[in-house]
Amino acid sequence: MKRNYKRPFLQFVKKAHKPLKLAIEDAVDVVCTTPDIGEMKTGDLSGIRVYKFRFNRQEYLVAYRPPVHESAVELLIIDFYHVGTHENFYDVLKRYLKQGADRGRIS
């Protein structure tokens, strides 16, 4: 399964320490093996799933959009939008998705 990392995701990972980067990599691997593991969001975030994992007694969230299962599509792509702690997580995610929609791009 192909992984597509969006800018907020990459910015957080770039600033993270090595042990946290490894934990994020493990979480991404879990999501890729079972894309339906995260909680489905509704409203402004419809179509987005959020997977939660713990690292050093802190809960982190990974926002992603699972692939659409179609028989004609051989290559499945998961879009990873954002990773971080709960503080301002959903506000940043909504802002990013709205910004992409305002520019005429499909997020």
Roles of regions detected by a PLM:
Residues 1-27, 107:
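Arg/Lys-rich, positively charged N-terminal/basic patches that mediate binding to nucleic acids
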Residues 21, 36-39, 101, 105:
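Residue-level signal for secondary-structure boundary elements
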Residues 29-56:
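A short, surface-exposed loop/turn module that caps and links secondary-structure elements
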Residues 55-61, 65-107:
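Enriched for short, Lys/Arg-rich terminal
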Residues 11, 30, 85-88:
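Active-site micro-motifs of SAM-dependent methyltransferase domains
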